[in-house]
From Swiss-Prot:
<dbReference type="GO" id="GO:0016491">
    <property type="term" value="F:oxidoreductase activity"/>
</dbReference>
<keyword id="KW-0560">Oxidoreductase</keyword>
<keyword id="KW-0813">Transport</keyword>
<feature type="binding site">
    <location>
        <position position="123"/>
    </location>
    <ligand>
        <name>Fe cation 1</name>
    </ligand>
</feature>
<dbReference type="InterPro" id="IPR038659">
    <property type="entry name" value="AOX_sf"/>
</dbReference>
<feature type="transmembrane region" description="Helical">
    <location>
        <begin position="181"/>
        <end position="201"/>
    </location>
</feature>
<feature type="binding site">
    <location>
        <position position="213"/>
    </location>
    <ligand>
        <name>Fe cation 2</name>
    </ligand>
</feature>
<keyword id="KW-0472">Membrane</keyword>
<comment type="function">
    <text>Catalyzes cyanide-resistant oxygen consumption. May increase respiration when the cytochrome respiratory pathway is restricted, or in response to low temperatures.</text>
</comment>
<dbReference type="GO" id="GO:0009916">
    <property type="term" value="F:alternative oxidase activity"/>
</dbReference>
<keyword id="KW-1015">Disulfide bond</keyword>
<keyword id="KW-0496">Mitochondrion</keyword>
<dbReference type="GO" id="GO:0008199">
    <property type="term" value="F:ferric iron binding"/>
</dbReference>
<keyword id="KW-0479">Metal-binding</keyword>
<feature type="binding site">
    <location>
        <position position="165"/>
    </location>
    <ligand>
        <name>Fe cation 1</name>
    </ligand>
</feature>
<keyword id="KW-0999">Mitochondrion inner membrane</keyword>
<feature type="binding site">
    <location>
        <position position="162"/>
    </location>
    <ligand>
        <name>Fe cation 1</name>
    </ligand>
</feature>
Length: 329
């Protein structure tokens, strides 16, 4: 009888003992970043001993592509709709012709030096629009005290992604003084141009970037095709560590694999900016950014549908909407 009572007491006390032990263990564990660190005045003395890690060069929001899947990335073109779109398209085509001509890219055979120099220059420009758009939407959210609904993060991640393209290419080749000077001048011009343009017409800037990314996909597709056909034989076939970490590439990844993932990034920016331009055109710039759901959990797209509506129903309505939109494109 005594043993039965003892066993019941032990069984009843077990949860309390377990909770107490866990609490004590939790209390005993000092947090890595907590009040002790927050109450300090400076961490200046730690700067000389902080290790340099390539993984810290970017945020954790990194692209994850399947190499076989992105082999199917296609060259696409969205036809201009109206004066704003036409102006954006003509501007991009003019910029491409001027750059291809003065950089001599369109003359002679394709070489590794031409490709890397071209990418170095263009990626310094490509990282500007996302930062400008993200900054202005950030200021707008503060000014009007309203939620941004996911646009800012997508634009800033785009800017960071383009910068990581640049960080990769400078590991393959360091630009000379003339190229560095031209980059500084071009960046200043593009920043001021895009800043003013975004204040006046965000639709124009997003459409401009969409067409710019169309050209980028064309360029990178041409590079991949030249490698496949043997017209371009890369000597720098080892992918830099910063690229392997950022895109989660294997150690035996090739220069072609690198171009493949960068092309996929540009294709994503292409559809994102064309979508944002379409949203401005339809006065939906204050709506939720669809890519915050599409890229992470597409099933949520159907969670807000009326009761009884199925995924198939939503898809058919989406097809009708796309058809109607295409009539105006």
């Amino acid at each position: 009888m005594f043993r039965n009572h003892a066993s019941r007491i032990t069984a009843a006390a077990a949860p309390w003992v377990l909770r107490t032990a866990c609490r004590q263990k939790s209390d005993a564990k000092t947090p890595v970043w907590g009040h002790t660190q927050l109450n300090r005045l400076s961490f200046l003395e730690t700067v000389p001993v902080v290790p340099l890690r390539v993984s810290d060069e970017s945020s954790e929001d990194r692209p994850t592509w399947s190499l076989p899947d992105i082999e199917n990335v296609a060259i696409t073109h969205k036809k201009p709709n109206g004066l704003v779109d036409t102006l954006a398209y003509r501007s991009v085509r003019t910029c491409r012709w001027l750059f291809d001509t003065f950089s001599l890219y369109r003359f002679g055979s394709i070489t590794e030096s031409k490709v890397i120099s071209r990418c170095l220059f263009l990626e310094t420009v490509a990282g500007v629009p996302g930062m400008v758009g993200g900054m202005l939407r950030h200021l707008s959210s503060l000014r009007y005290m309203t939620r941004d609904k996911g646009w800012i993060n997508t634009l800033l991640v785009e800017a960071e992604n383009e910068r990581m393209h640049l960080m990769t290419f400078i590991e393959l080749r360091q630009p000379g003084l003339p190229l560095r000077v031209s980059i500084i001048i071009t960046q200043a011009i593009m920043y001021l141009f895009l800043l003013v343009a975004y204040v006046i017409s965000p639709r124009f800037v997003h459409r401009f970037v969409g067409y710019l990314e169309e050209e980028a996909v064309i360029t990178y597709t041409g590079v991949m095709r030249a490698i496949d056909e043997g017209r371009l034989r890369p000597t720098k076939n080892d992918v830099p560590e910063v690229a392997r970490v950022y895109w989660n590439l294997s150690k035996n990844a090739t220069f072609r694999d690198l171009i493949n993932v960068i092309r996929a990034d540009e294709a994503e920016h292409r559809v994102v900016n064309h979508t944002f331009a379409d949203m401005h055109e339809k006065r939906l710039q204050n709506s939720v950014n669809p890519f915050v759901v599409l890229k992470k959990n597409p099933e949520e797209m159907y969670s807000n549908q009326p009761s009884g509506k199925t995924r198939t129903d939503f898809g058919s309505e989406g097809a009708k909407t796309a058809s109607n939109v295409n009539k105006h494109v």
